[in-house]
Amino acid sequence: MNYKTQREAARKGIETPEMKKAAEKEGVELKYLQEGLAAGKIALPANRNHLSLQAAAIGAGLKTKINVNLGISRDCSNMEEEMRKVEKALEMQADAIMDLSCHGKTQEFRKALLAISPAMIGTVPVYDAMGFLEKELSEITVAEFLQVVETHARDGVDFMTIHAGIRRTTLERLRKTPRLTSIVSRGGALLCTWMERNKAENPFYQYFDEVLDICREYDVTLSLGDACRPGSINDASDACQLEELITLGDLTLRAWEKDVQVIIEGPGHMPLNEIEANVLLQKKLCHSAPFYVLGPLVSDIAPGYDHITSAIGGAIAAAAGADFLCYVTPAEHLRLPSLEDMAEGIIAARIAAHAADIAKGLPGASEWDWQMSKARAELDWESMFKLAIDPEKARRYRAESSPELEDSCTMCGQSCALRNMKNL
């Protein structure tokens, strides 16, 4: 094999099995996908050690993808429960799963996940560092941070969040212009603490070339983390966030020089009216690299309903050009999500992604909606259930009611507009 990464293969005009599979899934020409990979506008996360992977691509002109977060923690360390979530996420057509495990047998869980998942798998190595190394944060050396990155890569992880964009200069800016909610990124806060305690630069920024060498060796896509993402709408689009974004743009070019694929992570909490501008800024400053957003959550008042605030922002962001949505569940800001929380979050994210694909004018995006509308016009309930994004819920709601007329529902009964027009 005379290439190390999908990007290198694309630049050399080599058609890889992963490219062919991804192009077939998307219904696009292989050449289009290949050119997008070579230009950095598309990423195809595919670690050569992830043997169960069914490759999928993220980026310009492709369907908006969704990611599901899960993993074990100190308070919730039940691996069996998290594996049930994995199975449910795959059943519900998640495109990617991020293992955010930060305590316990993290490598055991990660390997089990990689063994069964056809979806791409992402991790955040800095989360795992203290548990894996069994050391206090400030005592971890640069070499040990890199060791954890390489362990994740060797295990088969397809993409990794690396918070390389937050620097000591960013901390100085944060002191000069304080935020309402400071740093809310877990990885960002860990690195801020490490930098302050050791009076040193962010190790992932200072030793970025070493990170790139690891990513290149295993073809791990670099998901450049937004340590300065706003944790409240009050802090959105501030200097701290934008300073980091400029740094991420510079790091993107350095990664591409080594043929390492890149995704850029984005906000966060953000008012509706700022979302489109932020997407345009990211595409401009980060050279059209795929954009991966957490939400954005368009309001801060809805604990228990943040899958809704997130879906609103995600639909707007993706319609404006974001490529990858991280789901948010009703449990956001409250607890580790349950299986039921996860399912609600997935449906909300999938609706947002699909709505955005229609707005983007992707070929075939509205065909699903046409089929559903046709079934409704014909009062074809069975087809409606099969076409629903959540068939189980649609069937349950219908079964819980007893309409007077079998082909109507309990909302309108004999006054059903479609039924009456059909019978004219």
UniProtKB/Swiss-Prot annotation:
Catalysed transformations (reactions): 5-amino-1-(5-phospho-beta-D-ribosyl)imidazole + S-adenosyl-L-methionine = 4-amino-2-methyl-5-(phosphooxymethyl)pyrimidine + CO + 5'-deoxyadenosine + formate + L-methionine + 3 H(+)
Paired cysteines (S-S): none
Amino acids binding [4Fe-4S] cluster: C409, C412, C416
Chain ranges passing through the membrane: none
Enzyme Commission number, as recorded: 4.1.99.17
Gene Ontology cellular component list: cytosol
The protein's required cofactors: [4Fe-4S] cluster
Gene3D superfamilies: 6.10.250.620, Radical SAM ThiC family, central domain
Pathway(s) of this molecule: Cofactor biosynthesis; thiamine diphosphate biosynthesis
Keyword Translocase (UniProt): no
Record: residues binding Zn(2+): H269, H333
Free-text remark on how the cofactor is bound: Binds 1 [4Fe-4S] cluster per subunit. The cluster is coordinated with 3 cysteines and an exchangeable S-adenosyl-L-methionine.
Functional note: Catalyzes the synthesis of the hydroxymethylpyrimidine phosphate (HMP-P) moiety of thiamine from aminoimidazole ribotide (AIR) in a radical S-adenosyl-L-methionine (SAM)-dependent reaction.
PANTHER family named among the record's database cross-references: PHOSPHOMETHYLPYRIMIDINE SYNTHASE, CHLOROPLASTIC, THIAMINE BIOSYNTHESIS PROTEIN THIC
Protein name: Phosphomethylpyrimidine synthase
Organism: Syntrophomonas wolfei subsp. wolfei (strain DSM 2245B / Goettingen)
